[in-house]
């Protein structure tokens, strides 16, 4: 648990600092997640760890820090299935949205994380389109073109539904399971 929590906090720090600013709303989103999934003690520990990560990031420079991020992603990917990695990335997307907008540097950081976690880059576009309710967005959620056949639509739906099914991430805590349920519902609506 501790190594996962540390790796998770390293990734969260990467997203929070990606735009060059530490926003209160992003930190509060992280704290709420820690509180719900790990308890109040983890919030205090998380704040201390994040502060140390920010300090280390300043001292070591971008290239060295990105190597730590890569290593953390590889460690997480080695111990989690793809559905769990998707939910982790989904939470980091929520952190990036917490201040009301996603900076281009945050988007690049999220793309890096998706790649380093072994996820297809299209999953990010799908995550950003889940909350939209038009036909074009529905195709983007499913990762297919508007010219797709019915069979292609059905296959894409089955793939997404399987990846985001709440039962696949139940071991990661209630908050993650609820987020997966929300995504699963949005996929059904698409």
Residue map of PLM features:
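Small-residue-enriched hydrophobic alpha-helices in membranes
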Residues: 1-17, 21-190
